[in-house]
C-alpha cells in the first residue's frame, strides 16, 4: 500500500474519524489562478492541455501549492469519453464544447465504439500516473467521469444546452435509442474509471451535471439506473485500500435516498440542498460532500468564514463530511478568497471532531 501523508479525505468519505473536515474545490485547477492561465497559454488550447501529461499534472498541482487542500483532482474534462467515441469534440469561442458529429438516431448509436481506456484515452491514464508520481503521497488523487445521462446530453444536443429539447425529444419519441446510448456510455464509463483506478486514482467521482433537468421518474430511468450500473461495476479496492465512489447530481437534492441506495460511498450536494436535512435523510448510509454556493467566494473573507461556520454547524458533530463548493469555482474569484475558504474550513471544523 502506498503511504499517504494526508488521508483525511478518503477517511471522511468512508465515515471514519478525522481531525478536521477535509476540503477541496470542484474546478480547483482552473482559470481563477493566474498560473493556470499561463500553463494553458503554453499548451495552446484546452484539449492540448488535457492531452499533455506533464502540463495536466502541472495544473493539477497548482492549487495544492497555494492552499492546504486535502485532495487533488485529475485535470481533464468529462467530454473525453464522447471525444474518444469519434464525435469530433471542438471548442467554439464563447459557445463552449461542440461536436461535429452529434448522435441523432439509433443508427448513429449503433456505430459508436466503446473506447479502450488505455488506447484512445491513454493520455488520461498517463496524466493519472504522472500526477500520482509527482504527488509523492501528499494527498489522494480523485479520478472522475461524467454520468451517462450528462454525457448523452452533449452528444445528442451537439454541445451545451439550456432547454435540452433535442435529447428530451429523443427520450420521449425514441426511448429505445437513448437507452442504447446510455447503456454504451455506462459500459464505457465503467471501463474508463476502472482504468483510472488501476493507473492510480484513489477515489472516483461521477458528475451528473444535468440530471436535475429531469422529472423524478425520468431521473430514475435515464440517469440513476445507469450510474447504479457503473457503481456495481467499479473496482472498490486497489493498492490495499478501499476506493470510495461519490455521486453528484446537480439539482438532485430531492433524490438523495434513491442515490444512496446505489452502493456509492458519498453523495455530492449542490448549494440548494440543506446539509442538515441531507444528513438526517441519508447520513446513516453515505458521506456528504459540499456545499457552499460558489458565488459566496466573491464575498469578503469574513462573510465566507460565516458561511463555512453555518454549513459546518448544519452538518454537526461527527464523521462523514467533505467540505466543497456546491459546484465549480467561478473563473473570476480572487485566489485569496479561495485561500480564506480553505483555511476557515480547517480552523473552524476541529471542534466537530473529537
UniProtKB/Swiss-Prot annotation:
Annotated GO CC locations: cytosol
Main localization of the protein described in the UniProt heading: cytoplasm
Class in the EC hierarchy, top level: lyase
InterPro entries reported for this sequence: UROD/MetE-like_sf, Uroporphyrinogen_deCO2ase_HemE, Uroporphyrinogen_deCOase
Catalytic activity: uroporphyrinogen III + 4 H(+) = coproporphyrinogen III + 4 CO2
One biological process term in Gene Ontology: protoporphyrinogen IX biosynthetic process from glutamate
EC number: 4.1.1.37
Site residues, Transition state stabilizer: 77
Sample GO molecular function, one term: uroporphyrinogen decarboxylase activity
Cited function: Catalyzes the decarboxylation of four acetate groups of uroporphyrinogen-III to yield coproporphyrinogen-III.
Family the UniProt entry places it in: Belongs to the uroporphyrinogen decarboxylase family.
Protein name: Uroporphyrinogen decarboxylase
Biological classification of the source: Bacteria, Pseudomonadati, Pseudomonadota, Gammaproteobacteria, Enterobacterales
